[in-house]
């Protein structure tokens, strides 16, 4: 689950949905992206107990330390976030720290990586976002426009054999289609047949830049490491 529309932890039935998925397919990989500031420690401990398989994970989007994380993650209480993180990790479940790097927090990347290691995160990733920087936020000093390259299509959805369900319960092949509400596609076969064609599905072409068997992609990772 990923918050294209809100944070998954805010859902009333999130834990029940994950339990249902596990019941339907005991070998399914479960995952979540979150800012970690919602719910209480008991909720996060329960989630960790559900995420007991090796490949299950939670990505905590934490953009700095106590004095900077709230600048982008509006309204996030640092102490509550840390309590929730510790509660989840205490179950032995896998957690990944995902950090957006801006001018106000670029000096904290090393410290965030060390804190992630100290807390027991299994992975740490610092990245420079391609999203438009809003008022008051600055790109890091070393930032340069990311080069656009052409390469072969390696469809993430095809590799994972995954699907996307949006907040309105609509099924789609890929989360990248989630923002294209006016052209929402539910026919997975329709999309699959156009991935490597000379005339890709128009929504895929818009979302991923797919054209004539190739796709545009950017290098945005500053640092990505496995901690344990």
Model-derived features: positions:
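Radical SAM/AdoMet-radical enzyme domain recognition
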Residues: 1-3, 10-115, 119-127
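Flexible glycine/acidic-rich beta-alpha junction loops that bind and position SAM and/or redox cofactors
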Residues: 104, 124-144, 178
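Short, positively charged
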Residues: 134-150, 197-204
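A C-terminal cap/extension of S-adenosyl-L-methionine-dependent methyltransferases
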Residues: 139-154, 220-228
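Short, small/polar residue-rich loop motifs at catalytic or cofactor-binding pockets
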Residues: 156-159
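Short hydrophobic/aromatic beta-strand element in the GNAT-like acyltransferase core
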Residues: 162
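Short, acidic, Ser/Thr-enriched surface-loop or helix-capping motifs
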Residues: 165-166
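Flexible mid-to-C-terminal extensions adjoining Fe-S/redox cofactors in radical SAM and related proteins
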Residues: 170-228
């Amino acid at each position: 689950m990923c918050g294209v529309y809100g944070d998954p932890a805010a859902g009333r039935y999130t834990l029940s949905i994950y339990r249902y998925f596990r019941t339907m397919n005991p070998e399914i990989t479960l995952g979540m992206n979150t800012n970690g500031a919602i719910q209480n420690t008991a909720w996060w401990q329960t989630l960790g107990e559900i995420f007991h398989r090796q490949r299950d994970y939670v990505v905590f989007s934490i953009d700095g330390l106590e004095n900077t994380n709230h600048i982008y993650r509006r309204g996030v209480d640092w102490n509550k976030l840390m309590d929730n993180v510790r509660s989840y990790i205490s179950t032995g479940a896998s957690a990944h720290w995902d950090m957006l790097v801006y001018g106000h927090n670029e000096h904290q990347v090393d410290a965030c990586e060390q804190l992630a290691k100290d807390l027991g995160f299994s992975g740490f990733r610092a990245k420079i976002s391609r999203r438009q920087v809003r008022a008051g936020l600055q790109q890091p000093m070393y930032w340069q426009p990311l080069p656009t390259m052409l390469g072969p299509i390696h469809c993430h959805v095809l590799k994972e054999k995954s699907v996307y369900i949006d907040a309105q319960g609509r099924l789609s092949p890929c989360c990248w289609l989630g923002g294209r509400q006016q052209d929402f596609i539910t026919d997975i076969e329709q999309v699959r047949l156009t991935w490597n064609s000379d005339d890709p599905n128009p929504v895929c072409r818009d979302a991923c830049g797919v054209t004539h068997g190739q796709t545009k992609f950017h290098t945005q990772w500053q640092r990505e490491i496995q901690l344990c």
